[in-house]
């Protein structure tokens, strides 16, 4: 009995089998994996939400900052 899960590649829609040895999963190939990465890098894909004002970000003082000041 074949219980392997079939999935569609999120980029091209090609049907493939979900296998632990598929280094590109959930994609069908390195090409589709790189296309997806490029879409995230170019901000064609993004997680919805409101933008953060850079002025409102609070930074913490870490040990490296103290070393540089001495």
From Swiss-Prot:
Molecular function per GO: DNA topoisomerase type II (double strand cut, ATP-hydrolyzing) inhibitor activity; zinc ion binding
Binding positions for Zn(2+) per the UniProt entry: 9, 12, 28, 32
Alphabetized Gene3D superfamilies for the sequence: Erythroid Transcription Factor GATA-1, subunit A
Pfam families per record: YacG (PF03884)
Function description: Inhibits all the catalytic activities of DNA gyrase by preventing its interaction with DNA. Acts by binding directly to the C-terminal domain of GyrB, which probably disrupts DNA binding by the gyrase.
InterPro entries attached to this UniProt entry: DNA_gyrase_inhibitor_YacG, Znf_NHR/GATA
Self-association state and partner proteins as the record states: Interacts with GyrB.
The organism's taxonomic lineage, starting at the top: Bacteria, Pseudomonadati, Pseudomonadota, Gammaproteobacteria, Legionellales
Keyword Metal-binding: yes
Any one of the GO BP annotations: regulation of DNA-templated transcription
Cofactor binding annotation: Binds 1 zinc ion.
Region: Disordered, residue numbers: 43-70
Family statement drawn from the similarity comment of this UniProt entry: Belongs to the DNA gyrase inhibitor YacG family.
Cofactor or coenzyme needed: Zn(2+)
Organism: Legionella pneumophila (strain Corby)
Gene: yacG
Protein name: DNA gyrase inhibitor YacG
Keywords: Metal-binding, Zinc
């Amino acid at each position: 009995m074949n219980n392997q899960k079939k999935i569609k590649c999120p980029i091209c829609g090609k049907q493939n089998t979900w296998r632990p040895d598929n280094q590109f999963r959930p994609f069908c190939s390195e090409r589709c994996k790189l296309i997806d990465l490029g879409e995230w890098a170019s901000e064609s894909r993004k997680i919805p939400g409101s933008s953060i004002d850079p002025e409102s970000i609070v930074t913490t003082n870490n040990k490296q900052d103290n070393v540089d000041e001495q």
